[in-house]
Structure formats: C-alpha cells, structure tokens
C-alpha cells in the first residue's frame, strides 16, 4: 500500500512547539478531553448532527484526514499493525480482522486478535517493521513514532482519542474507508448508535425527572473523570450529575483527584469503579465515613470492566448497558 500525506500548516507549527518544549505523550488509550464542560442533567440520547459526512464508496485511492493531516491510501491494506486497543476492536467489528497482521500487547479483544509484545505506549519502529506492515494504525500519543514510520516509508494512520460519541461513529466509518470495508463499517456505526440510544432511552424512561449524582473511580487514590472527558459524556447521556466536575482541579485535564472528605460531602448516589475486583467494593465501603455515603448505604457501588469503561470502540454499548442497569436499579429505590 502506498500512502501520501499532506500536513496542515497549523500542525507543523504545533509539532515544532512540542518538540522545542520536549513534551512527551501520555498513555495511548487515554481519550482526549472533550469541549463539553459540564453535564446537562438532561437524560436522553444525543441527537445526530445534521452535517454528518457520508461514508465513501469503498474504492481506492481514498483520502481521509487523521491527526497529522490528509492521508491518501492508494489500495486496500493486507498487513495492518494496530497499536491501539480501541481501533483493534473496531477493525474486527467492521470485518477487517483478516487484514490485521499484528496488534499491541494490550489489544486483547476480540480473542482472535493477533496479540504480540509490540508496545502501544512506547512503539518501536524496528519491531513494527519486522511485520512488514502496509498500514500501521497508531494513537495520537505516538506522533513521534508515526513520523519515524513515515520517514522510512511505512504507511501510517494516526487517530486521536474519541472526545464524544460522534467521534466513535466517525472513526468506525473512517477505518472502513481505509480498509475497503465501508459497507460493514457503516452498518457497525449505525448499530452502535442505535443500540446505545436504545439503552439510554430505556433507562431514562424509568428515571423520569430524578437526577442522580455519581463519580467514576479510576484507581484507589480516587482519581476520577469529569464530564469533559469521553467517558464522562457517556454518563451525561443518562442525565447523571458528575460530582468530579466540582472538584478543585476538575478543569485540569478532566481527571481530578478527589479526596475522601469531598466524596463524603458530595454524597453521590452512585459510584462506578473501573479497577480491581469485588474486594475493591468492600474496601471502598470501609473508608472513613463512607458508610454515610448514599451509594454505599444503598449498595450502589458498581464494578466496571476497565477495558470496556475506557475504550471507544464497538463495546461502548456494553459500557452503556452497565451504566443503564445501575441507573434503573437506583431509580427503582
């Protein structure tokens, strides 16, 4: 596959600035901060934009826009290396699994994904090139690696983390365009959107005018995610009010560290935990004064699968179902 790339002038300036500052990227699977600042507390599925771009017809060459600018893919790839778990899941969901040669160490879903020891955190150009890829798909946290791959003529597609659900649908369709699976990708994007909306509307019907408060706990040190993040917007669709939005550093990257005192004072109705196991739920209940927190009192501390709660691929519906069930349980009390 031959890919040509055109960088926008604005991005060239940004790249130089980042290089000069010595900025390092963070984890590749962190979804980018969204522009939405606070939860709306209105329960309901998001409306589709009127200007949604149509998907291509599946022919090559095809030109798309990634995090680095315009990319032209001359022909359908046959040896894809995916270093992003979210994109790996999407590739298989749209029928491009047979075109995937290798995936990174954390791309563990679906089972048939050819998981290797390739790192998505610190990608190694030499290790990647050993798979003789005709397309490498990277997170935008690995821009330096992407530029190195392009420099040695390895076709590369750099996709940013989703900031909202519309990004999920758009990236699903984009992957369909660059792999030649446009019809399957369009069908999959429609499925995700339809099923997500159905889950939300079912929960909203039971919730009525009730507004529940919550926070998602990312680790035992009480780091959380605000409504300005991708995962925060999933909860926002259910009309939940995120107490993390009120945290002192809630506007600092969208991932504030809460204190036990803050949580007790805010008294959330629901707590979602995306790490650990059932013993973690017990440990949370034993924290000082947490026995007075509504979520603990009402057995409304819910354990989430960490992968499902952080990836923006086809399993975003599974994430919604977990949240929806928790909302319906609390609404019935």
Model-derived features: positions:
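Proline-aspartate-enriched helix->loop->beta-strand connector
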Residues: 77, 124-138, 154, 259-273
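Alpha-helical, coiled-coil/dimerization segments enriched in small aliphatic residues
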Residues: 107-108, 224-254
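Extracytoplasmic ligand-binding site segments that recognize negatively charged/polar headgroups
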Residues: 144, 159-174, 208-234, 279-281
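A short, structured surface patch at a secondary-structure boundary
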Residues: 56, 63, 79-131, 135-141, ...
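Structured C-terminal subdomain patch of bacterial secreted/periplasmic proteins
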Residues: 144, 167, 173-176, 186, ...
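Bacterial Sec-exported substrate-binding components of ABC uptake systems
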Residues: 2-83, 183-215, 326-333
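Short, structured coil segments at secondary-structure junctions
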Residues: 96, 152-154, 238, 296-297
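Short helix-initiation/N-cap motifs at beta->coil->alpha
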Residues: 67-68, 116-126, 249-260
């Amino acid at each position: 596959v031959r890919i040509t790339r055109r960088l926008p002038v604005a991005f060239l300036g940004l790249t130089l600035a980042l290089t000069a500052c010595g900025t390092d990227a963070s984890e590749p699977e962190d979804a980018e901060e969204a522009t939405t600042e606070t939860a709306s507390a209105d329960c309901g599925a998001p409306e589709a934009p009127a200007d949604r771009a149509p998907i291509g017809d599946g022919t090559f060459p095809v030109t798309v826009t990634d995090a680095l600018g315009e990319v032209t893919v001359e022909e359908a790839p046959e040896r894809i290396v995916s270093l992003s778990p979210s994109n790996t899941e999407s590739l298989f969901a749209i029928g491009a699994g047979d075109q995937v040669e290798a995936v990174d160490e954390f791309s563990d879903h679906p089972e048939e994904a050819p998981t290797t020891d390739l790192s998505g955190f610190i990608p190694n150009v030499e290790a990647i090139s050993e798979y003789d890829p005709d397309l490498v798909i990277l997170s935008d946290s690995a821009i330096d690696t992407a530029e190195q791959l392009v420099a040695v003529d390895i076709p590369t597609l750099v996709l940013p983390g989703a900031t909202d659900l519309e990004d999920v649908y758009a990236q699903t369709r984009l992957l369909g365009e660059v792999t030649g699976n446009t019809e399957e990708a369009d069908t999959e994007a429609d499925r995700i959107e339809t099923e997500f909306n159905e889950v939300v509307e079912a929960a909203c019907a039971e919730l009525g005018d009730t507004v529940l408060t919550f926070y998602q706990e990312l680790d035992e040190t009480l780091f959380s995610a605000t409504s300005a993040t991708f995962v925060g917007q999933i909860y926002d669709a259910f009309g939940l009010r995120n107490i993390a939005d009120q945290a002192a550093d809630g506007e600092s990257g969208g991932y504030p560290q809460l204190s036990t005192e803050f949580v007790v004072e805010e008294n959330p109705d629901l707590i979602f935990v995306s790490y650990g196991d059932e013993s973690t739920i017990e440990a949370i209940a034993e924290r000082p004064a947490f026995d007075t927190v509504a979520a603990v009192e009402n057995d409304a501390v819910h354990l989430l699968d960490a992968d499902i709660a952080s990836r923006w691929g086809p399993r975003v519906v599974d994430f919604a179902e977990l949240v929806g069930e928790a909302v319906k349980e609390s609404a019935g009390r």
